[in-house]
Amino acid sequence: MSRYLIGALLRLTAALPLSWGHALGTFLGGLLWWIPNPLQRIAERNLALCFPEQPRAERNRLLRRNLMETGKGLLELGPLWLWPRERVLQLVQGPVAGEEELAAAVNCKQGVILITPHLGAWELAGLYYSSRYPLTILYRPSRLGLDAITRRGRGRLGGQVVATDAGGLRALLIALRRGEVLGILPDQDISGIGDGERLFVPFFGMAAGTMTLVSRLALKHNAPVFLTW
């Protein structure tokens, strides 16, 4: 049932101008700020851990802005996953900084690792690069049974989407050996799949689990790493 509901919501938001979607996303974020929910609790806890010296009013201001941006990002999925190819790619305006260096690295055929955290326009970045390069994208399967929608959306412009499991790791290795591009969100938890171990390192004064997969692949295969967002 959730799959059909999500599909209907994606089609609805894809039918709207992007500015309308952003306005509705801001409204949705406001609701997430007022109504208790897991996204609110996690963000509130993280802000308290990272900025304990900040007054509660300032942390609440950051929390509200965070949830509004989250709402906008959620309502961008319909346009990104359903709009025609050219309309999606037109969202990337002007030259992309560093793309000449990226293209040169790809042409060396030794494999390239492209990393993007859950920050900024990372969904759009994946679509853009998969339209230009042979890209294998690592993702964590949804707990809501929405894998088919996610795979289709993220792979619609040519990317191969693989899960954070042993099969996905093999697919990454094969793509790297072919000299292709890997797309990895380095803030994912992929512990338990071989090279998916993590190290706990200081982050804003807290020990944060950090994947070692990217550094291991880069060192083992002499693959350059590019950051995008």
For each feature predicted by the language model, list its residue ranges.
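Membrane-anchoring hydrophobic helices of lipid-metabolizing enzymes
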Residues: M1-T116, L146-R152, R156-G158
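Membrane-associated lipid acylation/remodeling enzymes share a hydrophobic transmembrane-juxtamembrane segment
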Residues: P134-T136, A166-W229
